[in-house]
Amino acid sequence: MDGKFISFEGPDGAGKTSVIQQIQLELEDQLGTEKVMYTREPGGNKISEQIRQVLFDGQNTDMDGRTEALLFAAARRQHIVSEIIPGLKAGKVILCDRFVDSSIAYQGAGRGLGEKEIWQINQFAIDGLMPALTIYLDIESEIGLKRIAEHRSNQVNRLDEEKLEFHRTVRQSYLKLYQNYPERIELIDASQPLEKVIEDVKATIHDRFSDLF
């Protein structure tokens, strides 16, 4: 497969969406719109988007943690088969808003299901497919939640509404992943002004893929 698979991770409020949108625009200017694909998890195709609705429905407060983890993995599998593999075979640059690291951090650590256990569950889903590069946008939990309250209070989902300690645990798991997989994960300080964050992300992508930016 000739494409490039780049995932973006980070705690809630890190600004992933804004960063990815700008990166997508600039890569489309460079390569053409047909060579760049934005996608997200859970979601990215009809079936996975339907699973997303179940996962983020604010009324599903009694969802079991393992159910949540398995639904994320199911959505991921369909996403890989329907979107990511065809995109890579077509030689596209894939910008993915969250991938398996999110499950490890949110369900493995945040829900207390075990990071190794969630990784094992997802092996069946990903079948060895991992991003060539993961951009981790790091921000303190308090700052991230404050951003959510100020800028997208009308778009809060079931996971956003978790307590501060949950989000702190998620962040610590992300930092552990960054330490354990330095060959894949690059950390960007997301507390900086958005323009600086974007410049850092572009430089990081260029360092990994010299033909981009």
Curated annotation (Swiss-Prot):
Key words, A-Z: ATP-binding, Kinase, Nucleotide biosynthesis, Nucleotide-binding, Transferase
Any one GO cellular component localisation term in the record: cytosol
Reaction catalysed by this enzyme: dTMP + ATP = dTDP + ADP
Bridged cysteine pairs (disulfide): none
InterPro entries (UniProt xref): P-loop_NTPase, Thymidylate_kin-like_dom, Thymidylate_kin_CS, Thymidylate_kinase
EC number: 2.7.4.9
GO biological process: dTDP biosynthetic process; dTTP biosynthetic process; dUDP biosynthetic process
Pfam families xref list: Thymidylate_kin
Record-listed ATP binding positions: 10-17
Enzyme class, first EC level, given as a word: transferase
GO molecular function, one term: ATP binding
Organism domain of life: Bacteria
Family (UniProt): Belongs to the thymidylate kinase family.
Function: Phosphorylation of dTMP to form dTDP in both de novo and salvage pathways of dTTP synthesis.
NCBIfam families found in the cross-reference section: DTMP_kinase
Protein name: Thymidylate kinase
Natural source organism: Limosilactobacillus reuteri (strain DSM 20016) (Lactobacillus reuteri)
